[in-house]
Amino acid sequence: METQFRRGGLGCSPASIKRKKKREDSGDFGLQVSTMFSEDDFQSTERAPYGPQLQWSQDLPRVQVFREQANLEDRSPRRTQRITGGEQVLWGPITQIFPTVRPADLTRVIMPLEQRSQHCKPEEGLQAQEEDLGLVGAQALQAEEQEAAFFSSTLNVGTLEELPAAESPSPPQSPQEESFSPTAMDAIFGSLSDEGSGSQEKEGPSTSPDLIDPESFSQDILHDKIIDLVHLLLRKYRVKGLITKAEMLGSVIKNYEDYFPEIFREASVCMQLLFGIDVKEVDPTSHSYVLVTSLNLSYDGIQCNEQSMPKSGLLIIVLGVIFMEGNCIPEEVMWEVLSIMGVYAGREHFLFGEPKRLLTQNWVQEKYLVYRQVPGTDPACYEFLWGPRAHAETSKMKVLEYIANANGRDPTSYPSLYEDALREEGEGV
């Protein structure tokens, strides 16, 4: 499928990208990302051209995917003709398609537990985060707090019954625990809502008006349990060991056994969507689980000689973006999409290292990506495609199912992508 991209006479430098980037391919989906909006743009409820109403959060980009016709002979699409006759479109913030988690929560996941008691107080922690994040990251962190009530969370605790308030969050203690240290908190990976849909907890007697609201306290406890379980699962993945329900209950859940299903489910979702790790049951009798990379990928990006984090989650996102963009995406568009999640070319990320080197060198050497010059461009512009190893280990259908699952939808909700995936499977047979 030929890739179409409107450059609008601009160079290929990210600094020259227009506010709205369009890219269409013949009869398939195009992606429009609007990144710079004024505050007034988000004050009222907007209606998508062919979709439901959504209340847009302030200062967040939005994504509109629609059918358009493009000129196959060059990279300048013809005047678009939008299809309105029953064609379902994807209209929503890109952060609702791909997973996002707050830096403060990631710090809790990757920080050695034995250092937590020495960690700074909440007020000091926020100040330290802002210093580490820098101006851009601190602004994003502040925006995250404002957006928390709007976006559906990767760790959405949902509606719960009353939680026991006697126990405070107690992280698992292990003298042999492996540490995961971030290189820098200079990027923000989206937003995670601390708010569930509201628990119906009965408020007990209070001896002080300054005590924390029981409902918020219960939600915080549950949230802490989820994060601690993610930490435990990451350690088990690194040593390629099995984990049992009994171990999770004894190390993390403790007095909250009644809420194990919710905690385990949300921790598993976080592992899959953020780190690209699936938690699979191998023995229903003993409730034993194994942790494996998602989508049959044999790569996780963890180096034997360093305390790095799994990178297969980001790889799946990159493969998904390429697929959604018509199987080929200009480099500057890729970085614009990833920047929405706090991943910037040339800026060290506390989970993924230096992203540009990761995409243009490491994953090219691993044959997951093809990074090539766009023919006839001067100055040279580059684009990304799936590499042979990506085609061999996974498929468009599996990536589409991943995207649909992250968005809470069925793969058939994306007709053109679904047809493309089916066509690939048919050719494979």
Swiss-Prot record:
It holds the Pfam family MAGE. GO terms for molecular function: histone deacetylase binding. Transmembrane segments: none annotated. Its main location: nucleus. SMART domains: MAGE, MAGE_N. GO terms for cellular component: cytosol; nuclear body; nucleoplasm; nucleus. The keyword Iron does not apply. It is found in: Nucleus; Cytoplasm. Residues 194-209 have a biased composition (Polar residues). Residues 222-421 form the MAGE domain. Residues 1-30, 188-215 are annotated as: Disordered. GO terms for biological process: negative regulation of transcription by RNA polymerase II. PROSITE patterns: MAGE. Keywords: Cytoplasm, Nucleus, Tumor antigen. Expressed in tumors of several types, such as melanoma, head and neck squamous cell carcinoma, lung carcinoma and breast carcinoma. Expressed in testis, ovary, prostate, cancerous prostate, breast and adrenal tissue. Acts as androgen receptor coregulator that increases androgen receptor activity by modulating the receptors interdomain interaction. May play a role in embryonal development and tumor transformation or aspects of tumor progression. This is Melanoma-associated antigen 11.
